[in-house]
Design a protein with these regions (language model features):
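N-terminal anchoring/stem segment of glycosyltransferases
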Residues: 37-98, 220, 242-257, 261-270
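A conserved donor-nucleotide-binding helix/loop in the catalytic core
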Residues: 56-67, 94-124
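Acidic metal-phosphate-binding loop of nucleotide-sugar-dependent transferases
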Residues: 128-129
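Conserved donor-nucleotide/metal-binding helix-loop-beta segment in metal-dependent transferases, i.e.
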Residues: 133-160
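Catalytic core and acceptor-binding pocket of nucleotide-sugar-dependent glycosyltransferases
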Residues: 161-249
Length: 276
């Protein structure tokens, strides 16, 4: 009989980790893995729909605030690509439409068709700033009705601005569909679902997708005042959770100074060439 050799290795269980892969291996088709070994990720993607020639000044600080305070999986740029900023992922396509809202609408189709974007995602503008950590279940925001908002614009100027006219159009189309007219068009992040957003914007041609989507899908919401500050003198409260600005108030106003002081450290997205 051949001689037998037996080798005994004394290995502490903790040292086994050095023999294991440090990152998940790719999943190969044909192998079944129990779902309990692959917990579903709850983080959702953040979408920024950007025009091609966007000034990145506000966006830089919006991204810093997102990285600091808004849990997410990936940040996507759709459409434009500002120099010096590198997102986690990008959808590059030719935006179509006669105004910025129609351009955004065309980009939303691309987002909803993209298999790599999470099923539920947050839509951000480049002038949205998350001032406090976001925790708990998300509920979208709204402020009154579209009729209220259009009447406010009309009181300020009977000749409605292009933006006000798009809100009026959204209200009329939603009424014709038998839907509500809640004003979801506030300057705050909004949660969308890829499947239902396509169905919603196909039913209504208004470019104001927030109110179209919210009313057609009857999205739950919290009613609150819009957070946009457009003047140069308003100083936000330290406890504010979200802020929004325009180019002038961000560059020259107290609100812009407040935001820049809150987020002095560069984000992971500021790693390209030509920033600033």
């Amino acid at each position: 009989m051949a001689n037998e050799f037996r080798i005994t290795l004394n290995i502490h269980p903790d040292s086994l980790t050095s023999f294991l892969p440090q990152s998940p291996a790719p999943i190969t088709r044909g192998f079944c893995i129990e779902e309990k070994t692959m917990p579903k990720r709850t983080e959702k993607d953040i979408i920024y729909i950007l025009k091609q020639d966007i000034d990145p000044f506000e966006l830089i600080y919006s991204l810093r605030s997102v990285e600091a305070n808004f849990p997410h999986r990936k940040v996507w740029f759709v459409g434009g690509q500002p120099r010096g900023l590198v997102p986690d992922a990008r959808i590059e396509h030719r935006q179509t439409g006669s105004n910025k809202w129609e351009l955004i609408r065309s980009s939303m189709y691309e987002v909803a068709r993209n298999e790599d974007v999470t099923s539920d995602f947050f839509l951000f503008n480049d002038d949205f700033f998350v001032m406090q950590p976001v925790k708990g279940k998300w509920i979208n925001f709204a402020s009154g009705t579209l009729t209220d908002r259009v009447n406010q614009f009309a009181a300020e100027n009977p000749w409605l601005s292009p933006y006000a006219r798009t809100l009026f159009k959204a209200r009329e189309e939603l009424k014709s569909l038998g839907c509500g007219e809640v004003n979801y068009d506030v300057h705050l992040p909004m949660l969308f679902n890829k499947d239902t957003v396509i169905q919603a914007i196909r039913q209504c041609s208004s470019p104001q997708m927030r109110s179209v989507y919210g009313n057609i899908t009857k999205s739950p919401y919290k009613d609150r005042k819009d957070v946009k500050i457009g003047d140069l003198t308003t100083i936000p409260l330290e406890s504010c959770d979200f802020l929004s600005t325009n180019e002038t108030s961000f560059k020259d106003g107290k609100v812009g100074e407040f935001i820049r002081e809150r987020f002095p450290a560069p984000s992971r997205f500021e790693r390209g060439e030509g920033l600033g």
